[in-house]
């Protein structure tokens, strides 16, 4: 069987959930026994999201191979339970960078380099790249942005060309639109969808299926109307009604026969109905928890929920695994001080201090760590959160009041967190951190080893600073133990506080590897400890 390609575009408005629809369809096809992956093509000029402000773009998701990518790749991995890579996320900036570099190298032999064919050819090359590996039966491609946007035009043109270049049975296009509901008139309006599809068709792309995001069910009359004016069959107009959880969407799409439409259009034969047993079991636990805990998430980007998307989702997975609803309350670390920390963190069954960069909000994180340590509240610190564990312990247990990270003060007498040696000569910010999966050796008998069930693990990283090992003996004698280290470099990856109910800081990002069917052990452990603390 040839590799099949499904292209998913969006219209009317942004943030409709193309990534969730793509992930849901991919999950259904995977559940039929097909080998599936998803790729995201983003229309912004940045090479990657690594240097983007989380307030603008949400979380930067890191893959196993160290690519800094769009947060939608997190959805792809969580739904499918398989790894993505640099090849799964492409931006306009990366496309232009490649083409311009080739032009400088003389690859175009003096020709005038243009959007068509040079940019579109590079887009098409990357769209087809994963299909040439032989690893996948179906590749879904999400086109970022909204149809009609200037930035998206080269991508839509590339899809138009591929529709003609690929065999008809190897290519499918899906268009996601919004059906707004007018409360005054109490009716759903289809005109924005009609106009969006017309724009797509003017660009030469005819959608095979229209997915309509809606707050209210679509009647058969409305579906027929959309089909008539958008030039598709009535059965190819399906609704994506607002769901109580994003993890319910695959089941909703199955009820709407989206996977069946895809299998028929792509002429995929001899595959069974989707096996969604484990997925449904997860949803059942998620929908009917027996317990509830409150976790305080202390961070500096809390105003935008997407800034900590993977952490939020990891708590969903861990909650279901513990038959527990996890209420995550976000606390702006800038607002925390010694006088109000008890008030702001009152009611916490567990505390997580989030990753981040820069000086802003650090003191608030340190106060939160101290509160968790002294009050015996289950605690997890991630990346910068782990580093603040070290700083807090140095100041308040070892008595080094000036202890801090050199990210904040290069002149401190106690640089307990310091820049990694291989980072000190780096001046370029984009893509130069310690990124991707690295091995970690856990100490036998430690809390971490007990949670993981092994002493050899691999986790993903995104940082420039590390625990300063010259102070390791001081910390160990005072009670903060380094229980996880990189086997090659000795870099401290995990610190724990024996005697505390649950106190662990990790330099890596465990949230990136949590999925509904395989919740991450650190998050499961924190939620269980929070439950025990509540009792």
PLM feature spans:
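Extended hydrophobic-aromatic, low-complexity segments
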Residues: 304-307, 320-324, 338-341, 360-364, ...
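C-terminal and late-domain segments of enzyme folds
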Residues: 435, 439, 443-535
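Short beta-alpha connecting loops at secondary-structure transitions
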Residues: 56-64, 243-247, 353, 374-380, ...
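Active-site proximal loops enriched in glycine and acidic residues that flank catalytic Cys/His/Asp
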Residues: 10, 40, 214, 241, ...
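Flexible phosphate-sensing "switch/lid" loops adjacent to ATP/NTP-binding sites
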Residues: 1-327, 333-350, 357-358, 365-371, ...
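Short, hydrophobic alpha-helical segments
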Residues: 230, 262-270, 397-401, 526-535
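Cysteine-nucleophile active-site neighborhood
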Residues: 13-19, 23-27, 31, 344-439, ...
